[in-house]
Design a protein with these regions (language model features):
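N-terminal presequence-like segments and the immediate start of the first folded domain
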Residues: 1-79, 85-134
Length: 134
């Protein structure tokens, strides 16, 4: 966790100091990752909005790997994952890429997959995770 402190905020709330690390997004008003008290909260997406769910899933997972590393975590420490798909008929294709990436059974988090309007016609997937810091 030594590389985590670069974005550290110390917030005093009712006499208690909270150490919160925020990894700001390119988008205004949000972070790609936040860590606090040994937990990391990360959102991943394909910044390039590649064609097809397999490409967007792979790019989102590369993005997730990078953001997890920024907050001192990794896929082996995932606790909970929610995958949002713009079209649930793409779930089987997404699962192929996910299963290849996640690796052995010891890495498997609790996971849900939900159909959602992702706000535009090009974004096919967003992945939201909670992970332990390692």
């Amino acid at each position: 966790m030594s590389g985590v402190a670069k974005n550290l905020e110390r917030i005093n709330l009712k006499g208690c100091t909270l150490n919160i690390n925020r990894v700001h997004s390119r988008a205004r008003g949000r972070c790609d990752a936040v860590s606090f008290n040994g937990l990391a909260f990360v959102v991943a997406y394909d910044p390039d909005a590649a064609d097809g769910i397999k490409s967007q899933t792979l790019n989102s997972l590369f993005f997730l790997d990078a953001k997890l590393a920024e907050v001192g975590s990794g896929k082996e420490a995932l606790l909970q994952t929610t995958v949002y798909l713009s079209d649930m008929t793409m779930k089987a294709e997404m699962d192929e890429v996910w299963c290849e990436w996640i690796g052995p059974r010891d890495n498997w988090p609790q996971r849900a997959c939900v159909g959602a309007d992702l706000g535009d016609d090009v974004t096919l997937i967003e992945i939201v995770v909670i992970a332990a810091q390692i």
